[in-house]
Amino acid sequence: MGPMIRGDRDKDTICAISTPHGVGGISVIRVSGPQTLNIVSKICQFLPAHPESHKVYFGNLKNSQTGDEIDEVLATYFKEGRSFTGEEVIEISCHGSPLICQTILNQLVNLGARPADRGEFTFRAFMNGKLDLVQAESVLSLIESQSQQAAKLALRQLKGTLSHKLEEIEDDMTWILAHAEASIDFSTEGIEVIEENVIQVRLKKIEAGLKELVATFKVGRLLKDGFRIVLTGLPNVGKSSLLNLFLEDERAIVTDIPGTTRDVIHGDTTFEGVKFTFVDTAGLRDEATDLVERIGIQKSYEAQNESDVVFFVYDIEKGLGAEELQILESLDPAKTYILANKTDKIGGSKPLETVEKTLKNSKFFQKLADPAAFFTRRVFFVSALDKKVRSEVLKDLVKEFADLQVENTVLISNARHFENLTRALENTQRSQSVVAQGLGAEFLALEFKEALIAIHETLGKRFDDQIMDRVFKEFCIGK
C-alpha cells in the first residue's frame, strides 16, 4: 500500500466489497466520494434524483451499457456529513456470488469509481473528522475481536472513552504550555504569569493520569489478544490431558509413553468472555537423546519466554523432586502457576503444606515477591479427569490478573498508544524536574512540548505518512 496521504486521490470516488469475500447469502459493496450518486444511479436507475439519507431502496441493478439485469439489490443512501466516511455513501446489498460482486465492481470502475485501498474508508472518516485516530484503530480491533471482552473494549474505544480521557490530559497540557509561553513573552517586563507551585500541581495531575493509563496496557492487551498459556513440566505428567481438558477438545495425543509430545500444540478457547490460547510443549528432560525430542524441548523453552502465563505441571504422586525444582527455578515467578496433577491417584487430597515445605529452600521460593499470596492463589491441585478443573483454574486466573470489567474503566490495548503515552509520561516527569530546578519557562516549554506532541500523535492531531501507514496497513479492503 502506498502512502495514505495522497492529495487529489482523496477526492476520488472509491468502491469495494465490505463483507468477507467468498460465497454467501448477501454481500455489501460500499461506494464513497463526491460522485457516488452520479455513478451508482447509472446502474441503479430505480434511485430517485434526490434520495433520502439512511433510506433503503429496492430494484434491479443493470449493466449501464446494455441494460441487462445483473441482480436484484438494496441500495442504502447516506448523505454527505451523515455517513461513516463523512462523504456521500451508497451501500449496495447484492446476492453473495463472487461473480455478481465482481461484475458490479467492474461496472462502478468503468463509470469512474476507483477500487479502494486497504482501510481507505476508515481513513477518510478520520480525515473528515468523523473519527480520531484512536477511534479509527478501534474499528480494526472490533473487526478482529475474538472474545466478548475484546469486542467490549474496542466498542468503548470506538465510542470515544479513551479519546475523551486523552483530551482531558491534552487540555491540561495546553494550559501549561500557554502559561509557559506567556511567561517567556513577559519575562523582560518582570511579570510572573503563574506561580511555579501551580504548574507543579498541574504537572502532577497529568503525570497521575498518564501513569494510570500506561499501567492498564497489560490488562488491555490481555483483553484484546487473550492470555497465552504454556503448559510445561517433565514428560508424562499429564500436560496433554490438561490441554484437552482446558480446550474441551481432544487436541493432543495422550499416552503413557514419555516424550509423546514432540512439537508445540496450540489451541484457543474462551472463558467468561476472555480468549485463552493454550500451548502444550514437549516434556523437559536432560536425558533426551532423540533429535526430534531435543528440538521439541528447545521449542518448549521458546514458548515459555513468549507466554503470558506458564502452568508448571507435575505428578503429585511423584512429588517435587530435583528435576521438577530445576525446571521451576528456570521460570519467571511473576507468570508461573503450579498445577499438581493426578490428584485422583491419591484420593483427591490437597497437601498444600507439603508443596510449600518442599519449595521453601528453593531458588524459586526466594524469587517470589509474596510467597503467602503465591501459595494461596497460584497452586492448584487438579485432575485431568475432573471437568470442574477448567472453570476453577481459569476463574482464579482471570480474577488475579485483573477484574476484567471494561464497562467503567478506560484501558489502552494498542502498542502504539502505549509507546506514545510512555513517551508523554517521561517528558512530563522531566518537565517536573525542570520546574523543581528553577530552569525557567523556556526549558519547560521545550521539554513539555514533546509530551503534547505524543498526545497529538496518539489522537491523530499530528501525523505523517509513516504514522498513517502503520495504522491503516492492517485494515482489509472495504473498511
Swiss-Prot record:
GO molecular function: GTP binding; GTPase activity; metal ion binding
HAMAP family reported in the protein's UniProt record: GTPase_MnmE
Amino acids binding K(+): 236, 255, 257, 260
Cofactor(s) required, per the database record: K(+)
Cofactor binding description: Binds 1 potassium ion per subunit.
Localization, UniProt: Cytoplasm
EC number: 3.6.-.-
Subunit structure: Homodimer. Heterotetramer of two MnmE and two MnmG subunits.
Binding of (6S)-5-formyl-5,6,7,8-tetrahydrofolate, residues: 30, 91, 130, 479
Protein name: tRNA modification GTPase MnmE
Domain of life: Bacteria
GO BP: any one term: tRNA methylation
Domain TrmE-type G: 226-402
Keywords of the record: Cytoplasm, GTP-binding, Hydrolase, Magnesium, Metal-binding, Nucleotide-binding, Potassium, tRNA processing
Binding site for Mg(2+): 240, 261
Amino-acid positions noted as binding GTP in the UniProt annotation, renumbered to this chain: 236-241, 255-261, 280-283
Native species: Bdellovibrio bacteriovorus (strain ATCC 15356 / DSM 50701 / NCIMB 9529 / HD100)
EC class: hydrolase
Free-text function comment from the UniProt entry: Exhibits a very high intrinsic GTPase hydrolysis rate. Involved in the addition of a carboxymethylaminomethyl (cmnm) group at the wobble position (U34) of certain tRNAs, forming tRNA-cmnm(5)s(2)U34.
Sequence similarity: Belongs to the TRAFAC class TrmE-Era-EngA-EngB-Septin-like GTPase superfamily. TrmE GTPase family.
GO cellular component term of the entry, any: cytosol
